[in-house]
Amino acid sequence: MVKQTTEMNDASYLFNTGAGFNSQDYLGCHLAASGRAVFRVWAPHAKAVGVVGDFNDWQPSALKLLGATGIWQGQVPNVHAGQLYKFQITTPTGQVQLKIDPFAQQFERKPGDAAVVVEPMTMRWHDSLWLARRKKSRAANRPINIYEVHLGSWRRHLDGSYYTYAELAAELIPYVKQRGYTHIELMPVMEHLLDASWGYQQLGYFAPTSRFGKRDSFLSFVDQCHQANIGVFVDWVPGHFIRNYDALYQYDGTPTFEYADPERANNRRWGAWNFDLGKTQVQSFLISSAEYWLDQCHLDGLRVDAVSNMLYCDYDEGREGQVNQYGDNRNLEGIAFLQKLNTTVLTHHPDILMIAEESSAYPQVTGSVANGGLGFNYKWNMGWMHDTLDFFMMDPLYRHDHFNLLTFAFVYMFDERFILPFSHDEVVHGKKSLMHKMSGDRYNQFANLRTMLTYMAAFPGKQLNFMGSEWGQFLEWRDWSALEWVDLKDDLNHRMQQFTTQLNAVYRHNRPLWEQDHDPAGIIYTHTDDPDSSTMGFIRQAKRKYSFVVAAFNFVPVERQDYRIGVPYRGRYELLLNTEAQAFGGTWTKLETTFTAVDKPYRGQPASFTVTLPAMGALLIRPVKVIGGVKHAR
């Protein structure tokens, strides 16, 4: 047990008691005056610890154990930024092994895994206006339209080499801004060795990957995103870590970061080791990592990966007997850790977002910790995603028999605060791209995709789409090569990209599509019970009485003449979007752009108007001047 021999705010005490939320400022390598550096590492069961690196010809400089803290410390001369180093650990059995610095802020390029000595962070930020606006606005009441990106395959040079952070800033940021997205979500940028892991088996929890450049170049990328009014989320993996023996596994020769029980430690599904989330030092390590990315790197939020794996003792492992003291399979340490993580982070940064990728039916993922919830701001709506894809993959001839795939989500849409995700996981490993999933010939695949993305934009919840879907890339995603940008030479792909740009603009500039995403008052059900026609309609309502958007969908390739739509008020309405417009790759050369609602009740609404509902298409319509209303009430 660690004894408190100094003040309560002593860094070693805080780290050991699970309250060290900036432990990277204490542990790791820290340059001091006169070319010296202080090295500290937690290795509680080691017999001896040294540091080796370029500064001592890789001959160990001994560190001393600080009492009962489990932390080893030493000051080493002739240390300069850019030099490589590792810790040399002598295990309880006398084995000598080289280990990474868990708190390193930069690593050498793979295949090496030595840490790099870095200068203290001196980044001059230029995003004060962005941060000020972020503090003033509530996420629930603003548009969130996320472009998910794998930096290693968004673009590559002709020789196959990666774009640097600087090159990505020069091309990715203007592209995302032009397309109209509000945020970028980066698949993990934390240092990792295996490209095929996509970053989800992490080596460095405080280090942007060196594949694309140095730490400060990554910070500049984030800064430039904010200057362009684009938020940045990053995927973060606090549940499991890379198997490599020279990383965190058996760090001091005993289970240090992972569970002591080998069954609980071994994550067979992903070939990784599970963190012991009940260990206070591990809590300090992981929460410090989250705080580092949010505070020091100015990220706008973290998408926490594989939350289900942390909620259950035996998640997707097929093992029996993994139970808690209450006899069920809830991972009580994992649940408590997530509550502590979100409470800590959101207390320090109330304007950022913590997003859960959680695929089970665990309750109250976005509920408050005080009421027993996990405390996340958002949860990915995996059920909506799977059901929606299953519906659009189906031959339209059979959709009327499976309309529940769409309507079931209406039952639980407000149980959590949801993000609707068409992510990287759905376009890889033989699952096909979004475009390739769509039913029908090439023309109808584009029509289906336009309709599905419009359905997503109109449905309550924030939204996320993976790169390449915006133009309907046919090939599924491959992490080892760039997107198929050549597709844009094809007229249909080019028009699909223009459609996505317009849809994003309609979404962003119309409050009803996002202002009340998590409030039942944000949707009026007008036509959700007609499976025989395979059509659907509903109204998205903003807080202002006369600010709403009418959404109508036709999920079969049969045009509906004189299709009646019920609305709350008589008066004049205008078209926002017709997915079958020729400009988007459809067949409509002349669009109905205005509609007049009369006092003819329909489907529970006092007024109505008729439209021609395009085959395999969707319409978004808003009021212009209604009785008692105002023009363009957005």
Swiss-Prot record:
GO terms for cellular component: cytosol. The active site is at D305 (nucleophile), E357 (proton donor). It catalyses: Transfers a segment of a (1->4)-alpha-D-glucan chain to a primary hydroxy group in a similar glucan chain. Keywords: Carbohydrate metabolism, Glycogen biosynthesis, Glycogen metabolism, Glycosyltransferase, Transferase. It comes from Lactiplantibacillus plantarum (strain ATCC BAA-793 / NCIMB 8826 / WCFS1) (Lactobacillus plantarum). Monomer. GO terms for molecular function: 1,4-alpha-glucan branching enzyme activity; cation binding; hydrolase activity, hydrolyzing O-glycosyl compounds. This is 1,4-alpha-glucan branching enzyme GlgB. It holds the Pfam family Alpha-amylase. Signal peptide: none annotated. The keyword Transmembrane helix does not apply. Belongs to the glycosyl hydrolase 13 family. GlgB subfamily. Catalyzes the formation of the alpha-1,6-glucosidic linkages in glycogen by scission of a 1,4-alpha-linked oligosaccharide from growing alpha-1,4-glucan chains and the subsequent attachment of the oligosaccharide to the alpha-1,6 position. The gene is glgB. Its EC number is 2.4.1.18. Pathway: Glycan biosynthesis; glycogen biosynthesis. GO terms for biological process: glycogen biosynthetic process. HAMAP family: GlgB. It comes from the Bacteria. InterPro entries: A-amylase/branching_C, Branching_enzy, GlgB, GlgB_N_E_set_prok, Glyco_hydro_13_cat_dom, Glyco_hydro_13_N, Glyco_hydro_b, Glycoside_hydrolase_SF. Disulfide bonds: none annotated.
